């Protein structure tokens, strides 16, 4: 009988925001507007950087890569979420769920390390301005971007393999897309080893880049404190303010959603953090 149950699970259904069924239309409109603004904003950033030759610098190159990565990242999540408001029981195949998880994890980790690369770029621009152009050559920039993406691919392969080799007995995913932990909960067997593997991966992809960014800003601050002119302070603040804001929001939400014990997080909180 158990074998029969294992072979029957070929697709999943998302629980999504079914708890808020009375507000489906409102949520659909709100998230559609936010999604449109996000995609449009990233498209504008990439277009301006591409057209304006004055912006063909390492800092804006990394920014354009982050914008493109975030755009593709949302394509794997938000349309699925929006469709769940319209068709509440829309299923996804096991293969489709695997594919969605792989690309979601790849791009999420890629974003983490791209932010780290941007922190390194700011460090070099402020702390080593004379050597900045030499060290951050076009070749080095491409290698850093490829390195971030490669780490994302490798970590995604580990996580997806550890999850989708499990036998599944349940079909309702407690999320609006195929995230690692909600899918793992559908397994029929003990997943302790898989949970340990994925927790170690999460620690690596969140704490390591966050730590590197922290070190970069400690070095930046120590350099800025030596600057006597107000103009130098303004230039440094203008360079780092946007990146630091994104870093705080990104790593803050990621840490709460993926590092805190699940007993301390409500389902609604996890859903909203995932959207962020």
From Swiss-Prot:
<keyword id="KW-0716">Sensory transduction</keyword>
<dbReference type="GO" id="GO:0050911">
    <property type="term" value="P:detection of chemical stimulus involved in sensory perception of smell"/>
</dbReference>
<dbReference type="GO" id="GO:0005886">
    <property type="term" value="C:plasma membrane"/>
</dbReference>
<dbReference type="InterPro" id="IPR000725">
    <property type="entry name" value="Olfact_rcpt"/>
</dbReference>
<feature type="topological domain" description="Extracellular">
    <location>
        <begin position="258"/>
        <end position="270"/>
    </location>
</feature>
<comment type="similarity">
    <text>Belongs to the G-protein coupled receptor 1 family.</text>
</comment>
<feature type="transmembrane region" description="Helical; Name=5">
    <location>
        <begin position="197"/>
        <end position="216"/>
    </location>
</feature>
<keyword id="KW-0472">Membrane</keyword>
<feature type="glycosylation site" description="N-linked (GlcNAc...) asparagine">
    <location>
        <position position="190"/>
    </location>
</feature>
<comment type="function">
    <text>Odorant receptor.</text>
</comment>
<keyword id="KW-0807">Transducer</keyword>
<feature type="topological domain" description="Extracellular">
    <location>
        <begin position="161"/>
        <end position="196"/>
    </location>
</feature>
<dbReference type="InterPro" id="IPR017452">
    <property type="entry name" value="GPCR_Rhodpsn_7TM"/>
</dbReference>
<feature type="transmembrane region" description="Helical; Name=3">
    <location>
        <begin position="100"/>
        <end position="120"/>
    </location>
</feature>
<keyword id="KW-0675">Receptor</keyword>
<feature type="transmembrane region" description="Helical; Name=6">
    <location>
        <begin position="237"/>
        <end position="257"/>
    </location>
</feature>
<keyword id="KW-0297">G-protein coupled receptor</keyword>
<feature type="disulfide bond">
    <location>
        <begin position="97"/>
        <end position="188"/>
    </location>
</feature>
<feature type="transmembrane region" description="Helical; Name=2">
    <location>
        <begin position="55"/>
        <end position="75"/>
    </location>
</feature>
<feature type="topological domain" description="Cytoplasmic">
    <location>
        <begin position="217"/>
        <end position="236"/>
    </location>
</feature>
<dbReference type="GO" id="GO:0004930">
    <property type="term" value="F:G protein-coupled receptor activity"/>
</dbReference>
<dbReference type="InterPro" id="IPR000276">
    <property type="entry name" value="GPCR_Rhodpsn"/>
</dbReference>
<protein>
    <recommendedName>
        <fullName>Putative olfactory receptor 10J6</fullName>
    </recommendedName>
</protein>
<keyword id="KW-1133">Transmembrane helix</keyword>
<feature type="topological domain" description="Cytoplasmic">
    <location>
        <begin position="121"/>
        <end position="139"/>
    </location>
</feature>
<feature type="transmembrane region" description="Helical; Name=7">
    <location>
        <begin position="271"/>
        <end position="276"/>
    </location>
</feature>
<feature type="topological domain" description="Extracellular">
    <location>
        <begin position="76"/>
        <end position="99"/>
    </location>
</feature>
<feature type="topological domain" description="Cytoplasmic">
    <location>
        <begin position="47"/>
        <end position="54"/>
    </location>
</feature>
<keyword id="KW-0812">Transmembrane</keyword>
<feature type="transmembrane region" description="Helical; Name=1">
    <location>
        <begin position="26"/>
        <end position="46"/>
    </location>
</feature>
<keyword id="KW-1003">Cell membrane</keyword>
<keyword id="KW-1015">Disulfide bond</keyword>
<feature type="topological domain" description="Extracellular">
    <location>
        <begin position="1"/>
        <end position="25"/>
    </location>
</feature>
<keyword id="KW-0325">Glycoprotein</keyword>
<feature type="glycosylation site" description="N-linked (GlcNAc...) asparagine">
    <location>
        <position position="5"/>
    </location>
</feature>
<dbReference type="GO" id="GO:0004984">
    <property type="term" value="F:olfactory receptor activity"/>
</dbReference>
<dbReference type="Pfam" id="PF13853">
    <property type="entry name" value="7tm_4"/>
</dbReference>
<feature type="transmembrane region" description="Helical; Name=4">
    <location>
        <begin position="140"/>
        <end position="160"/>
    </location>
</feature>
<keyword id="KW-0552">Olfaction</keyword>
């Amino acid at each position: 009988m158990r074998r029969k149950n294992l072979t029957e699970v070929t697709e999943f259904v998302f629980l999504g925001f079914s708890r808020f069924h009375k507000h489906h239309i409102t949520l659909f409109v709100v998230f559609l507007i936010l999604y449109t603004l996000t995609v449009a904003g990233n498209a504008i950033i990439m277009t301006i950087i591409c057209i304006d030759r004055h912006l063909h610098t390492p800092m804006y190159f990394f920014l354009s890569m982050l914008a493109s990565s975030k755009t593709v990242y949302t394509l794997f999540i938000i349309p699925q979420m929006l469709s769940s408001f319209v068709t509440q029981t829309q299923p996804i195949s096991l293969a489709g769920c695997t594919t969605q998880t792989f690309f979601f994890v790849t791009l999420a980790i890629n974003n983490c390390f791209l932010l780290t690369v941007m922190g390194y770029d700011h460090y070099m621009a402020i702390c080593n301005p004379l050597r900045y152009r030499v060290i951050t050559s076009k070749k080095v920039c491409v290698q850093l971007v490829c390195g971030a993406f490669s780490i994302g691919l490798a970590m995604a392969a580990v996580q997806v393999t550890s999850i989708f080799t499990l036998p599944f007995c349940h079909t309702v995913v407690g999320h609006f897309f195929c995230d690692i932990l909600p899918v793992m909960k559908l397994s029929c067997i003990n997943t302790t080893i898989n949970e340990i593997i994925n927790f170690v991966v999460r620690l690596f992809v969140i704490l390591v880049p966050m730590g590197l960014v922290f070190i970069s800003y400690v070095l930046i601050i120590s350099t800025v404190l030596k600057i006597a002119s107000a103009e130098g302070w303004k230039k440094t603040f203008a360079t780092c303010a946007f990146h630091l804001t994104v870093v705080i929001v990104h790593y803050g939400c990621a840490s709460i959603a993926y590092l805190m014990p699940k007993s301390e997080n409500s389902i609604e909180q996890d859903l909203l953090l995932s959207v962020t």
